[in-house]
Amino acid sequence: MKKILLLFSICLISMLGYAQTNEDGKESVYIDYFSRPGSISNILAEALRNKIIEGIQEMNRVVLIDVDSNEALKAEARRRQETSAMGDVVARSEAMTTLGAKYLIQGNITSMQGIKKTDSKGKPYYKGSVSYTLKIVDPSNGTLKGTQAFSHEGLTGSIGDTPEEAILKTLDYAKISMDDFVNENFKIQGTIVQVESTKKDKAQTVYVDLGTKRGIQKGQKFTVYIEMDIAGELSLKEVGRLNVKEVLSGARSLCSVSKGGEEIMRATKEEKKLVIISRKDTFLSL
């Protein structure tokens, strides 16, 4: 009876909830509570989760919804903690799907430590070390879309006077790492609509049909592909790379061509469709 009432409440809430994709084409993604060992406090676990939420939100790529903001999901989470309901993930998946979630982000925290060190003068301090894994799941069928493990320690571990301070400072790296996480798992696709400037038959800058509505920001990187028909099947061939130079409007951005200017120019003259797909930043990337 409780389960029937819960699902009925969720159905009512869904009338006012989010669709799987909003009018700007952004996918609705719920972020669940994170699992953790008993040795890790809830305060530190929530601090990590909040930093991850901040990092994803700043990318503005998806409509991110915290399950903690939805009373039906909070109630369902409490229900799962009852002995009779432990391990029942079906109802939770049903809840997510009914509420319009395209994907669900789940987190599992492996460790959060402040490792004691001593400086050259013999003074003790602590170095943060945080490890966790994020999974992206399609709640409609349980399919795993992607998974990524993170470890912030060493050069990405911060220093503190206490273990807790070192851990909390290290969490800033978790926020920063969400840029690549979003670019890797929530790719965005568009097209080159016009070549803006050229030099010696090479495209130098181009306009693309993506802007603020899809969360595009200055510095975003794209891979450029030519759309080809091979024996009746559409295929993509990589021909270049772009960097967003300026976001002009909701649906337009100016990009500099960092690779493949000649191929892009040739394809434009031949009126071939040039598809762009977002990519994550790398240390040596153009």
Which sequence ranges carry the predicted segments?
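Short coil-to-beta-strand transition motifs
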Residues: Y103, V182-I188, E233-G240
